[in-house]
């Protein structure tokens, strides 16, 4: 439920392509910073409650394209090292080199989001990491699991040599 304009804003683009991301970022920026043109389709939409500052906008991405998009839009950029195959250092270099100052940021702001498994011992950490390995292995095959599998499920999974090679890389 909600007001029709807010419902439309939240549902717009539910099934859109990556090509609409730049416009979605621009719309979100305009909305959060109250800078949408008067004739914009969401110009009448206002955040509630009203707060003195807008939240920072960070684009989380795992590719060179997302680094460039964040740079072009002037957003902060978080590189999802745990998720992508792109080189983190190169992605952040692309972001910094192509950064365009905006109402969001005068200079580039970036971070690397990495996957870390912590435990009391290395053996325990390796056991806990099994569920993450199986989750990302499944994802690489186009199967999005509803949640991370349990360690037991991961231990009992019938891995192939190819699976182990993918996990190591």
Functional labels for PLM-detected ranges:
Residues 2-5, 49, 66-68:
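Short, well-ordered, mixed-charge alpha-helical segments that flank or form enzyme active sites
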Residues 9-19, 54-57, 79-80:
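Flexible, glycine/proline-enriched loop segments at strand-loop-helix junctions
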Residues 12-46, 87-169:
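An alpha-helical appendage that flanks or caps ligand/catalytic pockets
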Residues 63-92, 96:
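A conserved active-site cap/scaffold subdomain adjacent to cofactor or substrate pockets
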């Amino acid at each position: 439920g909600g007001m029709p304009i807010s419902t439309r804003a939240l549902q717009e683009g539910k099934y859109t392509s990556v090509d609409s991301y730049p416009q979605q970022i621009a719309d979100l920026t305009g909305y959060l910073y109250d800078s949408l043109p008067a004739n914009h389709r969401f110009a009448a939409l206002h955040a509630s409650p009203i707060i003195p500052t807008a939240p920072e906008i960070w684009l989380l991405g795992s590719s060179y394209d997302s680094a460039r998009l964040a740079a072009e839009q002037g957003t902060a950029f978080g590189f999802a090292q745990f998720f992508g195959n792109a080189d983190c250092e190169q992605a952040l270099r692309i972001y910094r080199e192509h950064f365009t100052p905006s109402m969001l940021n005068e200079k580039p702001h970036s971070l690397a989001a990495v996957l870390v498994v912590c435990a009391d011992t290395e053996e325990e950490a390796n056991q806990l990491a099994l569920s993450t390995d199986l989750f990302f292995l499944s994802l690489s095959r186009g199967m999005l699991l509803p949640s991370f599998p349990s360690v037991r499920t991961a231990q009992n999974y019938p891995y192939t040599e190819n699976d182990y090679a993918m996990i190591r890389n």
